[in-house]
């Protein structure tokens, strides 16, 4: 047998002996109630989520311990105790991916809560209206974790402890169990965290007073603003100004000057005067257009009279000449009547023209007066 083979056999024998010794130590410690945890982890998660997951695994481990070894211990069946808390923790780590769990806090709860079980049960019983053995096992495990954190982990606020207990009950507890858990832990917090609760109540009182004072200040400011607005509206009256007004959309200066208003008024007057003159020119009939008509009529009557005289025979007697004279006189009278009627018509037209001119002048004067009043 070579030396290398001898060394391998001796190493296997020493390893077997070491395993036997470790098993014997484990059995002895579990029977004696001693718990040994490996707390040398330095790379486990320490965030709030990791601590929450540690609570969940601890609640499951405590539930398993309460229904096995703890029950056997109460019943006096010590020979049945074969499920120590450290064994539960070891199996949990071996069968679950716990790389996102706060391993140190998980092992701490699995070690300290079973060691302090009697003191924690006393705290819980003081706030219960029933015996603790009548509690559901899940509710009992949640209350143990909450009581442990309220008593030993003072760095965790009591509101966080109550909130995490409610979340554990939502995952594992009964429907209405949150009422009992919340009531027990709230009363327990009043006893164990009295300074914290007092400080929290004072802070809440200050915030409520500030919140109540803010609307009053706002109303006072609003009334002052309304008063300022009223005084400014009374004091400031709209007055005409010749200052340039600059538009926000256009950088050019817009001037509301008096010259622009006067120019608009003068244009309005000129347009009214032109309209009046056009009306007068359309309504007036010029005498020059009437005179050729009168002359034509007179020439026609004279020509007709000459024709009548020239065509009469010489041999006619005196009555014939009298008839001619009568005809000529009648023609002359007709001409006079026509001329008189034409003169009357011309005079009537002139009178109408004069009336139209007077109306036009009066309308122009009224427009001028209105424009002055507007200025």
Curated annotation (Swiss-Prot):
Keywords: RNA-binding, Transcription, Transcription antitermination, Transcription regulation
Polar residues biased stretches: 219-255
Superkingdom in the source lineage: Bacteria
Regions annotated as coiled coil: none
Keyword Transcription regulation applies: yes
InterPro entries in the record: NusB-like_sf, NusB_fam, NusB_RsmB_TIM44
GO biological process, one term: DNA-templated transcription termination
Residue ranges, annotated region (Disordered): 25-44, 203-255
Record-level Gene Ontology MF annotations: RNA binding
Matching Gene3D superfamilies: NusB-like
UniProt similarity note: Belongs to the NusB family.
NCBIfam families reported in the protein's UniProt record: nusB
Function: Involved in transcription antitermination. Required for transcription of ribosomal RNA (rRNA) genes. Binds specifically to the boxA antiterminator sequence of the ribosomal RNA (rrn) operons.
Entry protein name: Transcription antitermination protein NusB
Organism name: Psychrobacter arcticus (strain DSM 17307 / VKM B-2377 / 273-4)
Organism lineage string: Bacteria, Pseudomonadati, Pseudomonadota, Gammaproteobacteria, Moraxellales
């Amino acid at each position: 047998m070579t030396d290398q083979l001898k060394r391998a056999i001796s190493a296997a024998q020493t390893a077997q002996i070491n395993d036997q010794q470790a098993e014997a130590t484990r059995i002895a410690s579990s029977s004696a109630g001693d718990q040994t945890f490996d707390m040398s982890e330095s790379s486990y998660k320490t965030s709030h989520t990791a601590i929450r997951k540690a609570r969940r695994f601890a609640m499951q481990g405590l539930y398993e311990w309460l229904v096995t070894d703890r029950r056997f211990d109460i019943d006096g069946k010590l020979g049945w105790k074969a499920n120590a808390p450290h064994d539960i923790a070891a199996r949990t780590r071996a069968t679950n991916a716990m790389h996102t769990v706060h391993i140190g806090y998980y092992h701490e709860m699995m070690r300290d809560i079973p060691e302090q079980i009697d003191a924690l049960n006393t705290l819980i019983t003081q706030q219960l209206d029933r015996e603790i053995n009548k509690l559901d096992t899940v509710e009992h495990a949640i209350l143990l974790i909450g009581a442990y954190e309220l008593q030993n982990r003072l760095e965790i606020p009591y509101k966080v402890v109550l909130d995490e207990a409610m979340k554990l009950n939502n995952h594992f507890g009964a429907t209405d169990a949150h009422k009992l858990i919340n009531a027990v832990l709230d009363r327990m917090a009043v006893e164990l965290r009295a300074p914290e609760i007092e400080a929290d109540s004072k802070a809440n009182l200050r915030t409520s007073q500030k919140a109540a004072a803010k609307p009053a200040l706002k109303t006072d400011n609003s009334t002052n603003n309304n008063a300022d607005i009223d005084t400014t509206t009374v004091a400031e009256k709209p007055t005409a100004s010749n200052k340039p007004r600059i538009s926000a959309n256009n950088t050019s200066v817009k001037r509301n000057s008096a010259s622009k208003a006067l120019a608009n008024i003068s244009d309005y007057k000129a347009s009214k005067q032109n309209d009046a003159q056009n009306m007068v020119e359309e309504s007036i009939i010029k005498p020059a257009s009437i005179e050729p008509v009168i002359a034509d009529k007179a020439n026609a009557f004279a020509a007709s009279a000459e024709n009548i005289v020239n065509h009469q025979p010489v041999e006619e007697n005196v009555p014939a000449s009298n008839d001619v004279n009568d005809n000529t006189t009648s023609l002359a009278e007709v001409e006079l009547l026509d001329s008189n009627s034409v003169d009357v018509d011309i005079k009537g037209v002139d009178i109408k023209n004069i009336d139209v001119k007077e109306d036009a002048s009066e309308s122009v004067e009224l427009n001028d007066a209105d424009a002055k009043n507007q200025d």
